[in-house]
Amino acid sequence: MAAAAAEFRGQARLPRFAAPRRYELRLRPDLAACVFSGEASVAVDVSAPTRFLVLNAADLAVDRASIRFQGLAPAEVSVFEEDEILVLEFAGELPLGEGVLAMRFNGTLNDQMRGFYRSKYEYKGETKNMAVTQFESVDARRCFPCWDEPSFKAKFKLTLEVPSELVALSNMPIVNEKIAGPIKTVEYEESPVMSTYLVAIVVGLFDYIEGVTSEGNKVRVYTQVGKSNQGKFALDVGVKSLNLYKEFFDTPYPLPKLDMVAIPDFTNGAMENYGLVTYREIYLLFDEQSSSASTKQNVAITVAHELAHQWFGNLVTMEWWTHLWLNEGFATWMSYLAVDSFFPEWNIWTQFLDSTTSALKLDSLAESHPIEVEIHHASEIDSIFDSISYDKGASVIRMLQSYLGAERFQKALASYIKKYAYSNAKTEDLWAVLEEVSGEPVKNLMTTWTKKQGYPVIGVKLKGHDVELEQDQFLLDGSSDSGMWIVPITLGCNSHDMQKRFLLKHKFSDIKGINSQYDDQDRQNSGNFWIKLNIDETGFYRVKYDDELTTALRNALQMKKLSLMDKIGIVEDAHALSIAGKQTLSSLLHLLYACRDEDDFSVLSHINSVTSSVAKISIDATPELAGEIKQLFIKLLLPTAEKLGWDPKNSESHLDAMLRPVLLVGLVQLGHDKTISEGVRRFQIFFDDRNTSLPPDTRKAAYLSVMHNVSSTNRSGYDALLKIYRESTEVEERLNVLGILSSCQDKDIVLESLNFIFTDEVRNQDAYLVLRSVIIDARETAWSWLKENWDRITKTFAASAILSDYVKSIVTLFTSKEKEAEISQFFATRTKPGFKRALKQSLENVRISARWVDGIRGEAELAQTVHDLLIKL
């Protein structure tokens, strides 16, 4: 019989001859012993003749003697660990229709932040455990046997047996609670149909604060005891988000309550469990006195993102992980829409270009993937929770909304939510609704954007009074691919408002007479004539202008004739084109010089990112010029940094508060002596007397300044930072310290910092910050450490997302083909499915950097360009 059961091995998905309709679960977590036990009673609908029931189970001990279906014991029970399936084979065919499957099981409350796991916290000086679930993507099977795929939606009725002094939360409100000595039994209301990955449980000691929506839904934020005040901002954003989404989707929030809980140990930023959203503490808690402006904004964006999922993802769920972007792309886009409504002064849609830039960078790799990516095994799923599913997904949604118009787009989304509520949908289902409501050929337009990897670069050439456009796939390795997309083109001529809009459906297109009103003399006059494609960067593509148009745009930028978004697009496109060898670094430096008077947060953030990239590559590409290039960038950033200063002003804007640390950290990383000295001075005053103020927005710059001077023989600053880390109870403060610990050249200090992540003092989810802070001068030290400790790393940090971060952080510091070959050889026998994609992408980035180094070395005019611009500044 086992041979027959084996036919279900190696399948991407479970067979559909039986499906769950209702789960009744009773779970007993033992927080002291870190184990749990449970019983499941599942109403199963058998829809086709079979003698098998096939479901998922992993890391569970299922009591085989307890298994019954309609009173029948299976003749054979097979567990296939690699496939994470449990196959029950019965002696004869099962009766068609609904029957009940019952079983008992037990497992471990693991420390891997997945499935049913334990998280540590401090209470009255004692370390305690809380029990937490994290089931997305495929880890509900680690808590109870189930049909662990999004399309197997069912109702859930949960009962928990927990220590009587603890708070026990689940998706639904409590309907009954009985205390019997040290144990209480908590029974929850039955849920509407939902996917297994959205089931949630949290058990621990908590305080909470409460609000209520316009519909009367209770919203609570749960925190560690004594921290409830830090949940007020998230609560306010949460209530406002539910109210806004109810109106936007024309559909009420589907559940009676919503709880949001801060979890100390948490792999992801947050998880949108239906009615019980869990967060890493840094993404839910905000303290007016000790939190930075960036933390405040991150909390708002994260809360708005997770609550958008209550409609896009929970009420309407993707049919399979291939359509993950329907969850994550829309939640990302909706979060910006919500935050823009709540805080218009944050100019959040301009900041959205951070997401677009991240997606464009990843999607210009040959090792990227389409938005809709085929999933053949559960181990592949986690690797697509990346910038493609989130940021490219959100960016193409923004592009489509721009093309259809906001009103039609909103109406279509509301129709989509209503049509597929309490069920599942594929990407094609969304396109069909959008076509029906808008009357536009949405599927034809969007299919290449979701099913095809990559995106185009649009070449723009001026031919007399006409403009010629040509599209090719853009790849950072400089190779060409004649990929074709239907591209929504927006074009401005001499004005942001003078736009042409059309679809580029072919490789080539001509725009006739666009500049016929300008004679040759006008065109030669600086700033009199310019053309900008992709107005406000609503399209997901890059643009390469010919030399004449490049010069004209540079002049327009210098004369402040472009919108903030257009400035960002021009700078980011030029940076990418330089890396790909399609434009010179000299051309990019001239463009950055044209931005010398810029003072906007978003634009300067992108400029700072580009200058950091160029400064790093110059160390390998042109070491004799690296110092001068840094001085050039210091001169570019310094005027605005000096105007802002180190101390916040009472009346300053949120964006100025965000800009200050960007510039100060940038100047420290570029080695600006005056900024470093001031950072060290302020740190010393703060360290000597903690009652002195070191504003949260400037702490990272001060800490980084201290690390600049640290060495094995001068480690007082390093020890002071570790003391702050150990004494602080504020999450943001501890993360600030971790994020700079490896930022020095001294080999011994770097190794001490890297080994620090193996101690109990660093939570697993935070360890990547130490690796990310390694500087180029210490990359060989870090690489040797990674090789020597790889087995320990994979054992300690099993989550594939964490391993991916480790690999990317260190591998991408290198810029030679020889190093790429060495790294590739090391990992040849050490890959795991969960981080294989991240490794391939990291190695590709090394090859791209090596090619960029070669290109820069071949630029004869670069030294003269740097000298000339230094004199001008």
Swiss-Prot record:
Transmembrane segments: none annotated. It catalyses: Release of an N-terminal amino acid, Xaa-|-Yaa- from a peptide, amide or arylamide. Xaa is preferably Ala, but may be most amino acids including Pro (slow action). When a terminal hydrophobic residue is followed by a prolyl residue, the two may be released as an intact Xaa-Pro dipeptide. The keyword Acetylation does not apply. Keywords: Aminopeptidase, Cytoplasm, Endoplasmic reticulum, Hydrolase, Membrane, Metal-binding, Metalloprotease, Microsome, Protease, Zinc. InterPro entries: Aminopeptidase_N-like_N, Aminopeptidase_N-like_N_sf, ERAP1-like_C_dom, M1_APN-typ, Peptidase_M1, Peptidase_M1_aminopeptidases, Peptidase_M1_dom, Peptidase_M4/M1_CTD_sf. Residues 96-203 are annotated as: Required for membrane association. Zn(2+) binds at residues 305, 309, 328. A motif (Dileucine internalization motif) lies at residues 721-722. One of its GO terms (cellular component) is cytoplasm. The keyword tRNA-binding does not apply. Its cofactor is Zn(2+). The active site is at residue 306. GO terms for molecular function: alanyl aminopeptidase activity; metalloaminopeptidase activity; peptide binding; zinc ion binding. One of its GO terms (biological process) is proteolysis. Its main location: membrane. PROSITE patterns: ZINC_PROTEASE. Gene3D superfamilies: 1.25.50.20, 2.60.40.1910, Neutral Protease Domain 2, tricorn interacting facor f3 domain. Disulfide bonds: none annotated. Substrate binds at residues 136, 269-273. Its EC number is 3.4.11.2. The record marks 390 as: Transition state stabilizer. Dileucine motif seems to be involved in protein-protein interactions. Homodimer. Belongs to the peptidase M1 family. PANTHER family: AMINOPEPTIDASE M1-C, PROTEASE M1 ZINC METALLOPROTEASE. This is Aminopeptidase M1-D.
